[in-house]
Regions:
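Active-site glycine-centered loops adjacent to acidic/histidine catalytic or metal-binding residues
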Residues: 10, 115, 237
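Alpha-helical elements of Rossmann-like donor-binding domains used by nucleotide-donor carbohydrate transfer enzymes
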Residues: 40, 61, 95-96, 125, ...
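Conserved beta-loop-beta/alpha segment of the NTase-like Rossmann-fold superfamily
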Residues: 74-153
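Conserved alpha/beta core of the MobA/IspD/sugar-nucleotide pyrophosphorylase nucleotidyltransferase superfamily
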Residues: 4, 174-244
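N-terminal glycine-rich phosphate-binding loop and ensuing alpha1 helix
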Residues: 1-62
Length: 244
């Protein structure tokens, strides 16, 4: 079984502010639903057996859109409600998404943050690969908005991010640094489950990078592939969305 998890629970505060009204950015469009980030992500590749969508902010509106505009995939979609989207970090949405499928038999899980637009060619390649995948993009690494990862001298992966968007700090020698593409692929169900159950309640309430770090630190360099997106847009504002 192939599973895609998309987390869209956040309040979209910067997007709503730029638009002048409350809006769940993953379902925003100007002319039709096919322009929305959620539609674009799901229809990048419809070969998944299951789509897990974790919502929170404007959950009823999300549910209605799925009922009305994703009816042909409705049997494949699991919609999960995150009631703590204001109190907890992004890790809790990932926790709920993984919890929904943790007892299933799966061969691969792709996890994507729901505010992204990426090029179809790169995403399809990610889906076709039989290995674990981390992703990066070509944007400048700025503390004000970037999630970065670097390789230490032994090619171990380390993710770095400042929730206050002030500074990024690396306190050890490193061999490379990249701007994260915020989409990952997991092909080891055993390591995924080990990583899932190894985190405590407080850790899950932080960022989703805690789980990502826990999973990929269990892998050797030859056990994963890195894909660089040819086009990658993190749609924080309406101006970002209009770049698509």
């Amino acid at each position: 079984m192939k599973i895609l998890i998309i987390t869209v629970a956040g309040t979209s505060s910067r997007f709503s502010e730029s638009l002048g009204k409350d809006c769940l950015k993953c379902i925003y469009y100007k002319n039709n639903i096919k322009e929305s980030l959620l539609y674009r992500m799901i229809y990048q590749n419809t070969d998944f057996d299951c789509y897990v969508i974790v919502g929170g902010f404007m959950y009823d509106e999300l549910n209605q859109v799925i009922e009305n505009d994703f009816s042909e995939l409705k049997k494949k979609i699991i919609l999960v409600k995150n009631s703590y989207f204001r109190e907890y970090g992004s890790g809790y949405s990932l926790y709920l998404g993984l919890k929904a499928i943790i007892n299933m038999e799966f061969s691969q899980v792709v996890f994507a943050e729901g505010d992204l637009y990426v090029d179809k060619e790169s995403f399809e390649r990610l889906c076709e690969l039989k290995t674990n995948v981390i992703t990066c993009n070509d944007e400048a690494i700025l503390a004000s908005k970037a999630v970065a990862f670097y390789y230490d001298v032994n090619y171990g992966i380390h993710y770095i991010y400042d929730v206050s968007h002030n500074v990024l700090e690396i306190r050890e020698p490193f061999t490379g640094i990249f701007n994260s593409g915020q989409i990952w692929k997991f092909v080891s169900s055993d390591k995924l489950k080990e990583s899932f159950f190894s985190l405590n309640e407080v850790e899950w309430q932080g960022t989703n990078l805690v789980f990502i770090q826990r999973y990929f630190e269990r892998l050797k360099r030859e056990e994963y592939t890195m894909i660089r997106f040819k086009k990658w847009i993190n749609c924080n504002t309406i101006s970002d969305f209009e770049r698509i």
